[in-house]
Design a protein with these regions (language model features):
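Nucleotide/pyrophosphate-binding catalytic subdomain
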Residues: 2-127
């Protein structure tokens, strides 16, 4: 018997802020993802924050301090992506697809440690 998992192709889909800018657009993104799943692709989704959210968060950090701590800045601005990813995962589950949003520390993704400019040095993925 052939293990279908071994012959599945993987595709990485990246959706920018405008494409996830509203709930209706997120639903459309989920239809796109579902279309790849129907073609037996393993799908990895990367999403930006909804349009305008990152700018709003940046402005909030500036209103708190013109010298905002970079570690806290990174924690703050990443929340926009977390919201988008959770909404996408929730919608995918609603339409019957297995889905899970992940935060970088849950994998974990290891960086060189430079806040607001770090490069990924390692991704620890366990099958």
């Amino acid at each position: 018997m052939i293990n279908i998992q071994l012959i599945m192709k993987t595709i990485v889909l990246k959706f920018g802020g405008t494409s996830v800018g509203s709930i209706d657009r997120i639903k459309m993104v989920c239809k796109i993802i579902a279309s790849y799943k129907k073609k037996n692709y393993k799908v990895v989704v990367i999403s930006s924050a909804m349009s305008g959210v990152t700018n709003d968060l940046v402005n909030k950090s500036k209103s708190i301090s013109n010298n905002f701590d970079l570690a806290e800045y990174d924690a703050l601005v990443s929340t926009g992506e977390q919201v988008s990813c959770a909404l996408i995962a929730g919608r995918l589950k609603h339409i019957g697809l297995k889905s899970r949003s992940w935060l970088s520390w849950q994998l974990p993704i290891v960086t060189e440690g430079k806040y607001s400019g770090a490069r990924i040095s390692k991704i620890n993925i366990k099958e």
